[in-house]
Swiss-Prot record:
InterPro entries: Riboflavin_kinase, Riboflavin_kinase_bac/euk, Riboflavin_kinase_dom_sf. Its EC number is 2.7.1.26. This is Riboflavin kinase. The lineage of its organism: Eukaryota, Fungi, Dikarya, Ascomycota, Pezizomycotina. Catalyzes the phosphorylation of riboflavin (vitamin B2) to form flavin mononucleotide (FMN) coenzyme. Pfam families: Flavokinase. Its cofactor is Zn(2+); Mg(2+). Belongs to the flavokinase family. One of its GO terms (biological process) is riboflavin biosynthetic process. Pathway: Cofactor biosynthesis; FMN biosynthesis; FMN from riboflavin (ATP route): step 1/1. It comes from Aspergillus clavatus (strain ATCC 1007 / CBS 513.65 / DSM 816 / NCTC 3887 / NRRL 1 / QM 1276 / 107).
Amino acid sequence: MRPDGPRDPVVGPDSGPEPPYPVRLSGPVIKGFGRGSKELGIPTANIPAEELAEHPDLQVGVYYGVVALDPAKFQYHGDASRKGEDSQAAILPAVLSIGYNPFYKNKTRSIEIHIMPPLSSPSPTAEVTTQGQGHGQVKFHKLPDFYGTQLKLLILGYIRPEFDYVSLEALVEDIRVDCEVARASLQRPAYERYLAGGQGLDAVEKQRRWLVSF
């Protein structure tokens, strides 16, 4: 079960990713368990877990990083500052889980990626909206379906281990906090450069070139 107590608002060293990060993963977006959007209201892009064989020390848990989708099949139009750049893949922030999701007791390991809006956009998970009868609702960022599109992922840091939960609502709330922790962690200069570029750092630009090369 998830331990009681507040969560750290930021994770990872301020100086930037440390080994083994960044970790590269890629693959076509495939159908997952069908729960992300339907039950949880959290759209996820799943990619095949076979590539994890190249990273045997990568533990199960929740991570943050950046992603890009093949622009030949999917173009992101949610950032007005990118007008005229449709031929270039957009690099977007992401939070992801690698593991078995103890709440659902999955038998096979999966990679489930939730793509967030640009850091310049308002965060949809910053607060919980109150519905009728006092129930709270979380709105997560949603994109049109892009099954079959090639996705590239750079994992930049680790957030937390997997937990089981007493309720679906508790699981959703922890994922909401994961999104906020990921955003805050990526907003630091040493991480934001993987999204924005323009820092003149060869190591970062090399990773960015890999992300957008399809």
